[in-house]
């Protein structure tokens, strides 16, 4: 999702913005994530409360992908130049915190107990694009 004046962006908005400006970007190809649309996360949390559930529930997007794949898909979705995306390994980054290679979750409990149905990555991009239009 989009929040005006965020102190920190997310990978989708960062990649979109950089590619729109024609900036060459370095993107790790050895880390995997389940991108999560903020409204899906909020709906999942609300469902826990409404269904009076407790315990551990994994809530995330339903698509697991590498960060480089995510950025390529952003470029494809918005019709941006993928040739300026440079795949790199995590080891060459001097990240302040070590990142795990995989952070995907098993959503089966949330789907069964909460009727959790997160958007696909492209559905999330559709929703994000509508938010961006509304803000401008």
Residues covered by each model-derived region:
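Amphipathic alpha-helical segments that line or abut small-molecule/effector binding pockets
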Residues: 39-47, 122, 126
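Residue-level signal for alpha-helix termini/capping positions
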Residues: 19-20, 49-50, 133
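NAD(P)-dependent short-chain dehydrogenase/reductase
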Residues: 1-33, 39-40
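Conserved C-terminal active-site "lid" loop/helix of NAD(P)H-dependent oxidoreductases
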Residues: 66-72, 89-128, 132-136
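Mid/C-terminal beta-alpha module of Rossmann-like enzyme folds, strongest
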Residues: 44, 51-96, 136
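Glycine-rich Rossmann NAD(P)(H)-binding loop
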Residues: 27-32, 57-65, 113
């Amino acid at each position: 999702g989009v929040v005006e004046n965020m102190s920190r962006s997310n990978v989708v908005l960062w990649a979109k913005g950089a590619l729109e400006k024609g900036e060459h970007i370095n993107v790790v190809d050895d880390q995997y994530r389940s991108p999560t649309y903020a409204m899906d996360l909020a709906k999942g949390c609300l469902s826990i409360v409404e269904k009076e559930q407790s315990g551990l529930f994994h809530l995330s997007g339903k698509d697991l992908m590498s960060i480089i794949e995510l950025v390529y898909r952003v470029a494809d979705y918005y019709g941006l130049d993928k040739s300026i995306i440079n795949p790199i390994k995590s080891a060459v980054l001097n990240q302040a915190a070590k990142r795990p290679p995989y952070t995907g979750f098993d959503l089966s409990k949330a789907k069964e107990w909460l009727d959790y149905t997160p958007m696909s990555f492209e559905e999330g991009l559709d929703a994000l694009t509508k938010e961006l239009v509304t803000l401008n």
